[in-house]
From Swiss-Prot:
Region annotation Disordered: where it falls in the sequence: 567-613, 636-727
Segments of skewed composition (Polar residues): 579-592, 703-727
Low complexity bias spans: 647-666
Main location: cytoplasm
Protein encoded by which gene: cep78
Record-given protein name: Centrosomal protein of 78 kDa
Functional note: Centriole wall protein that localizes to mature centrioles and regulates centriole and cilia biogenesis. Involved in centrosome duplication: required for efficient PLK4 centrosomal localization and PLK4-induced overduplication of centrioles. Involved in cilium biogenesis and controls cilium length.
Family (UniProt): Belongs to the CEP78 family.
Keyword Cytoplasm: yes
Gene Ontology CC, one term: centrosome
Protein's cellular compartments: Cytoplasm, Cytoskeleton, Microtubule organizing center, Centrosome; Cytoplasm, Cytoskeleton, Microtubule organizing center, Centrosome, Centriole; Cytoplasm, Cytoskeleton, Cilium basal body
Keyword set, alphabetical order: Cell projection, Cilium, Cilium biogenesis/degradation, Cytoplasm, Cytoskeleton
Disulfide links within the chain: none
Sequence ranges of Basic and acidic residues compositional bias: 568-578
């Protein structure tokens, strides 16, 4: 590869190395201002400080470069102004005009920029500030903008291109797929230039509407932010735009969905143009910045209304487009004070002070009546006189008392005179600038929330959590203190309800026994029929009395049941007991009361299960028990005739038991019939049933004999004990 081609190829990717190489070829020193920001991908310098011989390496390096991100060339030269201090010395000379102000140099700069735009795919921002661009320069620059595929921001501020030059640039901007921001501040534009901008916005809106329709097919949602076109237009400091240009722009932005910011400061807009913008916001919801400040013909109330509407569109979102800030009034107030010595009013030359600056004290108004305190000014006294106070001491005392000493009365020799020239400290433009700062606090302009520190947010979270815990603690303490006797009463009522429910369940159980034909168990337990009433009025007194009177009865029944089941078990095993064996059973062989109770409960459960065989056996036992009890009663009357009272009570007791046994027998016969039907339906043999019945009859006869003898023996023992107790 040829060396020149290799160097050119390397220079396209490294501006600094190629620039230094070209400077070395022409034996010149690289300018430090040019190399200052190259490392950051930015070429930014003041063109007024560049000599004609130094422009050639810069332009040749810029033509072939493909790596720069930002190109900014500025010129701040003000033609027609003499050097400072020329009047003082009486010397008048013309300032040296920098080479950038010539038409040949501006044309060469525009050609180099056009070449860079054509070959570069990384250049994003192009700024030409204060260059006197002619029509020829703008035409060649428009070709580069049309060929560019990467530039997004174009700024031609203070380039004095006019309406004709703007029309040339607009032809390239209209069809550019990448340019989003244009800045034509101070370009001597009129309402015609505003119409050119409006035509660009309208043309791009029509094209983007068609693209949005195409992307919305098949139920898709078009992304408006990704579409090409202008997003911000800046036309500040073009005083000839006026209301006509403002109305042309307002008509376009009313239907636009893509423009985000429009800057029109110092454009000669009055209330008519401002009202047109306010009407446009009835349909526009995407414009988040409309800067019409510094237009003194707009009322403050109308300006505030428009800015409020703009901030409502912003929705406190963090946008990439920000409001341009104006210089604060504090910076404007910092004016250098000039001091010089003049003759005092008495004709003597003394130390007098003249201060030219801004006064914090209001000036004296002619025709206004002031109080004696405001007009009081003591006469100065000569040195050495009583009450003399040096002026320096007086000034220090006034400063300590925060009293401004702008006005001092004229005095004699060696006295200081301070003269203050007041000027207005506020203007209509500054008032309009302050509106945005006030509204920022009320509506939170986008980006202001980012300045809040994370520590404050965490502190707020902790305070909120502490408040919530305090409220919970307070609620719990109040609930503990509010517990009174009523809650205890309610708890007692709950206990009573549970007891009542248990009684109702018990009475329901007794009703089930009665419905099942097992009411005799309740009679044996000593529970009267009156106890089967509703649980609302429990009648347990009769039950308690009968249990006290008939205490030995349950034990006796348990013994009888024990003998019955013992006899049945013997029959099942095939053992045959005679009368002698049954007589041999005495009180020593009887089971204990605990075993009898346990056996009684098991027998009751078997009865609740409706066992037909067991009920049949009980019926046989009860039928055989009746003659035995009658014989025992006759025997007791014959043997103990003298004891009529005891025998009478025994006979009545035996009669009651006999009646109970008869009822049991009748109930068992009724229950035996359905049981026999069920046995026939199940398919059992008649022979097995007859053998079981014969076996049951034999067991019942044996148990009746044993029970009758045991009952007779027990009744004799009880009668003897009662007789001995009476004696």
């Amino acid at each position: 590869m040829i060396d020149s081609v290799r160097i050119r190829h390397q220079g396209s990717m490294d501006f600094l190395s190629h620039y230094e190489y070209l400077c070395a070829l022409q034996d010149s020193v690289p300018i430090p201002a040019v190399k200052a920001n190259i490392r950051h991908g930015s070429l930014s310098f003041n063109a007024d400080r560049i000599k004609l011989s130094d422009w050639l390496p810069i332009l040749n390096s810029l033509k072939i470069n493909k790596s720069l991100l930002n190109v900014s060339i500025k010129s701040c030269h003000q033609p027609g102004l003499g050097e400072f201090g020329a009047e003082k010395y009486g010397i008048y000379f013309k300032r040296r005009i920098p080479p950038i102000r010539s038409k040949d140099m501006t044309f060469q700069v525009c050609k180099a920029i056009t070449s860079c735009l054509s070959v570069s795919g990384s250049l994003k921002e192009l700024e030409l500030h204060g260059l006197p661009l002619r029509e020829r320069d703008l035409r060649i620059l428009a070709k580069g903008l049309a060929a560019s595929s990467s530039v997004e921001s174009l700024s031609l501020a203070y380039c004095s291109c006019g309406d004709e030059g703007l029309e040339i640039i607009c032809q390239s901007v209209k069809n550019s797929p990448t340019i989003k921001t244009v800045n034509f501040t101070g370009c001597n534009l009129t309402w015609r230039g505003a119409e050119h901008i409006a035509s660009i916005i309208k043309h791009q809106a029509t094209r983007r509407h068609s693209e949005a329709w195409a992307e919305s097919l098949r139920y898709r949602r078009p992304d408006l932010d990704c579409m090409a076109g202008l997003r911000r237009v800046t036309l500040n400091s073009n005083t000839l735009v006026g209301d006509r240009g403002a109305i042309a722009l307002a008509e376009v932005i009313g239907e636009d969905l893509w423009l985000k910011a429009l800057d029109l400061r110092q454009c000669g807009i009055s209330n008519e143009g401002a009202q047109a913008f306010l009407n446009a916001f009835q349909t526009n919801t995407t414009l988040i910045i409309l800067d019409i400040r510094r237009n003194p013909l707009i009322d403050r109330s109308l300006l505030k209304t428009i800015i409020e509407r703009v901030l409502m569109n912003a929705h406190d979102t963090n946008s990439e487009y920000k409001w341009y800030t104006s210089p604060s009034s504090k910076d404007n107030g910092k004016v250098r004070q000039k001091w010089r010595s003049i003759n005092n009013w008495n004709g003597r030359k003394g130390k007098n002070i003249v201060r030219v600056g801004f006064s914090t004290k209001k000036p004296m108004v002619i025709g206004r009546k002031y109080s004696s305190k405001e007009l009081y000014c003591p006469d100065p006294r000569p040195p050495g006189a009583e009450g003399f106070l040096p002026w320096r001491t007086a000034e220090r005392a006034k400063r300590h008392r925060d009293v401004s000493g702008e006005w001092a009365s004229p005095g004699k020799a060696d006295t200081a005179v301070k003269v203050i020239m007041d000027s207005e400290t506020s203007s209509e433009s500054e008032k309009s600038d302050n509106i945005l700062s006030i509204l920022d606090q009320e509506y939170a302009v986008p980006g202001s929330g980012e300045k809040k520190s994370v520590k404050n947010y965490k502190c707020l979270q902790l305070e909120f959590e502490n408040t919530r815990l305090r409220q919970i603690n307070h609620t719990l303490s109040e609930s503990l203190h509010s517990r009174t006797a009523t809650s205890v009463i309610l708890e007692d009522e709950g206990v009573l309800d549970s007891i009542e429910k248990s009684f109702s369940k018990f009475h329901a159980f007794l009703d089930l026994l009665k419905d099942a034909g097992l009411g005799q168990l309740a009679n044996l337990a000593g529970i009267d029929q009156s106890d089967f009433a509703l649980p609302g009025d429990p009648q347990m007194s009769s039950t308690i009395d009968k249990i006290a009177q008939q205490a030995p009865m349950p034990h006796q029944d348990q013994q009888e049941t024990f003998f019955i089941h013992q006899a049945q078990s013997r029959d099942k095993k095939g053992e045959h007991t005679g009368p002698s064996e049954s007589n041999a059973l005495t009180a020593d062989t009887l089971p204990s009361s605990r075993e009898a109770d346990k056996y009684c409960t098991t027998s009751q459960k078997s009865k609740e299960g409706f066992d037909p065989d067991l009920k049949a056996r009980e019926a046989n036992v009860n039928s055989g028990r009746l003659p035995a009890l009658e014989n025992a009663q006759t025997y007791l009357y014959d043997k103990k005739g003298s004891r009529n009272e005891c025998s009478a009570s025994d006979s009545s007791r035996s009669q009651r038991s006999s009646l109970g046994q008869k009822s049991k027998a009748s109930a068992s016969e009724k229950e035996r019939k359905p049981s026999s039907k069920r046995s026939h339906s199940s398919g059992t043999n008649k022979a097995s049933q007859e053998s079981i019945a014969a076996r049951d009859e034999k067991a019942a006869a044996r148990s009746n004999a044993s029970i009758s003898e045991s009952e007779i023996q027990e009744k004799m023992n009880s009668s003897e004990s009662m007789h001995s107790g009476s004696h």
